[in-house]
Amino acid sequence: MKMQTVVETIVANHGMTEKFWKAVETHDEFYLSVTNEPYMRLVIEVTSEGYVSVAHYYRQNGDAMRDPEVVFDPADWHAVEYTQDSLGIYQRIEPGYYSQGIETFAGIWARNIKAQGFCEVKPEVPAVS
């Protein structure tokens, strides 16, 4: 399972495929937050550089903490950044290079995101009258 497949599936399941790819192309704002208890909230964003950020978030002392965040170049879906706030880790990969360790981690994380049910279409919960 690749992160590209996971992102595209989640975005499609939320009816946001066209908006997502337009944001990638034009570097416009795109934000999708997916709650799937008991797991941490998953956020997919498009950065001002046109990169795709995938992150799990939790709160610590009122601050949003990334656990982790991996930023991908959608041209080839190689990771360009890795952040793990709780450990104070930030890595930026130079253009034209890639990190085998981060790529391997991203593949494992993509499989975990799928296994945790983030890629499934959730039925709408009817409003209580």
List the model feature ranges, each with a label.
Residues S53-Y97:
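Amphipathic protein-protein interaction modules
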Residues E81-S129:
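Helix-rich interaction surfaces within compact, conserved domain-sized segments
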Residues M1-Y58:
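Negatively charged, low-complexity tracts enriched in Asp/Glu with abundant Ser/Thr
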